[in-house]
Amino acid sequence: MLISFCIPTYNRKEYLEELLNSINNQEKFNLDIEICISDNASTDGTEEMIDVWRNNYNFPIIYRRNSVNLGPDRNFLASVSLANGDYCWIFGSDDALAKDSLAILQTYLDSQADIYLCDRKETGCDLVEIRNPHRSWLRTDDELYVFNNNLDREIYLSRCLSIGGVFSYLSSLIVKKERWDAIDFDASYIGTSYPHVFIMMSVFNTPGCLLHYISKPLVICRGDNDSFEKKGKARRILIDFIAYLKLANDFYSKNISLKRAFENVLLKERPWLYTTLAMACYGNSDEKRDLSEFYAKLGCNKNMINTVLRFGKLAYAVKNITVLKNFTKRIIK
């Protein structure tokens, strides 16, 4: 069986090399692997580094450098288009593979699931400081889910602890290539930062879809390096609302119960009080208004949200107080 590591990258030469090292250092597995890298016109010597790796290591590297920067969303998709494998393990170029992850994955592959979803370990930016040894996406142990009907999906959604359970985190996703290729992509998801989630949710909603949850941290997530924060902490919060409310409407507008179950996963990721306090600290007037509207769509009390937001100046003044700092740190990560 061939596993394709599908890695979108842009100017992350050093991090990418750490990822390749973590793959090369895997032991005790009996799988064929290939590395598929879509480089978004990097200028940091990534291409030269790849040439060195090709000469020094046994696994094949399929590398394509885009002539222009396509933007992150199109590059996510481009990395998968390079793959020849039975399964694609979609991987952020700043993350790393945990020890023995391929050997562990191999023990699950007999289920022939359409999707494998694994947990992650969270570290500092150096991949050394352990901040959370096991971040779980579901409140269950290992489980094989079969989605024959909407009740099956609703039960699954009720067990999600965050939007990681509905495919937000790239490096946790291992998907059958033929299932991915069968989806007719909706180009309106370009620019949402979550184009892959549209495809994964389309697979998830396919009758008979098999999802195998691996309650083990096979991935090391590099902290303090969220590319979604480039436009600020407040915008980072709104990205989740914009994409996941769109997903809720596009997939479940005709099933109120399932739509609510999906939206509740977003509320677990972005609990209203913590998130509103963070927005009060970091958001401008437009961003605060948008957050208030989003929570109203989720059934939250708009007056309560706006009351908390009005304390923005006070919240900003005391944001270094331990309690509030912990609140905002929980949301902005």
UniProtKB/Swiss-Prot annotation:
Please state the pathway this protein functions in, per its UniProt record.
Bacterial outer membrane biogenesis; LPS O-antigen biosynthesis
What InterPro entries would the database entry show?
Glyco_trans_2-like, Nucleotide-diphossugar_trans
Give coiled-coil spans as residue ranges.
none
List the GO biological process terms: O antigen biosynthetic process
SUPFAM superfamilies named in the record: Nucleotide-diphospho-sugar transferases
Its EC number(s): 2.4.1.60
| Reaction(s) catalysed (UniProt annotation) | CDP-alpha-D-abequose + alpha-D-Man-(1->4)-alpha-L-Rha-(1->3)-alpha-D-Gal-di-trans,octa-cis-undecaprenyl diphosphate = alpha-D-Abe-(1->3)-alpha-D-Man-(1->4)-alpha-L-Rha-(1->3)-alpha-D-Gal-di-trans,octa-cis-undecaprenyl diphosphate + CDP + H(+)
Look up the domain of life of the source: Bacteria
**Gene Ontology MF, one:** glycosyltransferase activity
Which one Pfam family would you cite for this protein?
Glycos_transf_2
Q: Which UniProt keywords apply?
A: Glycosyltransferase, Lipopolysaccharide biosynthesis, Transferase
Is this entry keyworded S-adenosyl-L-methionine?
A: no
In terms of PANTHER family, this protein maps to: GLYCOSYLTRANSFERASE, UDP-GLCNAC:BETAGAL BETA-1,3-N-ACETYLGLUCOSAMINYLTRANSFERASE-LIKE PROTEIN 1
Protein's job: Catalyzes the transfer of CDP-abequose on D-mannosyl-L-rhamnosyl-D-galactose-1-diphospholipid to yield D-abequosyl-D-mannosyl-rhamnosyl-D-galactose-1-diphospholipid.
Entry's family note:
Belongs to the glycosyltransferase 2 family.
Kindly provide the name given to this protein in its UniProt entry.
Abequosyltransferase RfbV
